Amino acid sequence: MPKQIHEIKDFLLTARRKDARSVKIKRSKDIVKFKVRCSRYLYTLCVFDQEKADKLKQSLPPGLSVQDL
């Protein structure tokens, strides 16, 4: 089941959870989607600013597998 997260802080807290497995980053022309897979839900954050997306990618937890699509 998918769920959408609207705040960057909430997304980072979700990515730091113990059951978070991986993050997939999907880029299109004007939007970047970060998808974190947890045990029950797939959480999605939509970012419209490329600079914020790059900062967010650097601040992801180091133990998480990150995949650019």
UniProtKB/Swiss-Prot annotation:
GO cellular component: cytosol; cytosolic large ribosomal subunit; cytosolic ribosome
Gene Ontology biological process: translation
A Pfam family the protein falls into: Ribosomal_L38e
Domain of life from the UniProt record: Eukaryota
Keyword annotations from UniProtKB, A to Z: Ribonucleoprotein, Ribosomal protein
Listed Gene3D superfamilies: 3.30.720.90
Entry's Gene Ontology molecular function annotations: structural constituent of ribosome
Family classification: Belongs to the eukaryotic ribosomal protein eL38 family.
PANTHER family registered for this protein in UniProt: 60S RIBOSOMAL PROTEIN L38, LARGE RIBOSOMAL SUBUNIT PROTEIN EL38
Protein name: Large ribosomal subunit protein eL38z/eL38y
Source organism (scientific name): Arabidopsis thaliana (Mouse-ear cress)
